[in-house]
Amino acid sequence: RTIYIDNILLNTGTLPSPEFTCSVTTQSPDLNISEQLITIETIANNGIGNSSEFNMDLENTAFNGETKIIDFSCQTEYGFELLSSEDIEVGTVSAVDPLGPDNYGYYIYDSGDTNYSLVPSYDWIDIEDVGNPLNTVNDDDGNNQDDSQVINLPFTFKFYGEEYQQITVCSNGWISFGSSDLESFRNDHLPGPGGPSPMLAVFWDDLTADSGGAVYGYYDELLHVYIVQWNNVKTYEDNSNESFQAILFDPAFYSTPTGDGEILLQYEDFNNTSNGSYGGGTPLHGGYCSVGIEDHWGTTGLEYTFNNTYPRAARTLSDDSALFISTRKTGAVWNLAQAELELSNTDINYEISDDEILTENITLSNIGEEESILSYTISTS
């Protein structure tokens, strides 16, 4: 769509401003400005003036809430030069729009972003019976028992432009990329000084893994994903039950424009009950839980929720919610439906002599989950 703009300017100086001729350009994606010159008229001191009109084309791939930057390079007939820029926000952002991007280019899509192709669908992948218990993490059974464990990833995962072969999983609902000895339970803003950097806060809160709770890790070779699942863990303050998982997609198999890995967060049982106040004195930890991401400097990131408050683009989390974290703007969330092979004949051992031809019909069926894709290899020996 084409947008027409003229600027209203105020001269706060003590002298009249001269007439400027300005070129208008932009480096912002999804925004096109053909080479244009505008004129800013002479403005009296403490007076108001206008620029001439210019236009720009905004592509349909632009998201509500995104900030676009327009650059102005201006000069007068006397050789005076002025460089300036103007920020404009696209549309009006609401809970049905993605959160972001941050300064790196990450977005967080939630289940309510139904007008966008990358809207995630909740589809819990339970790894309790097949995953590896993270025994160090599972030692967190109460006050000051916080634990974290370093896990070797089965693939290289790129996050904020940095490549990692390990992650650190904490009992308190977060993952750090690389090795960390932190066990931070006091959740904070994202990005911010609290906790490790980089960080994926899945449900960062003061949690315990006692009373049947546990944390598991599992590599699904068929789906090319690594899953971390906090299963029936409890909030330390109110003993509320929480079950949630983070699914890391192998970037070598699931490509993105930046090469960064994508992440799906799923919440089977979500109870955001820790208000951070224990009755007098300094609160022991931040209010409620933190959900979001931050980079290795701790300066760039996206905060989906903290202290039970949400930005305009975020939908309130609840049971059976999903979040998808990506640098992509188009496409679809990867299909993680589980396939299952069924053969019409399982006795397929044959001996064939020289010059003999044997014909056999075998039917291969996918009896797995709806929309699953079955990959298979047939070999002979």
Residue ranges, per PLM feature:
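Acidic, glycine-anchored loop motifs typical of Ca2+
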Residues: 1, 47, 144
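Beta-strand-rich interaction surfaces with strong enrichment in secreted/lumenal proteins
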Residues: 37-45, 140, 155
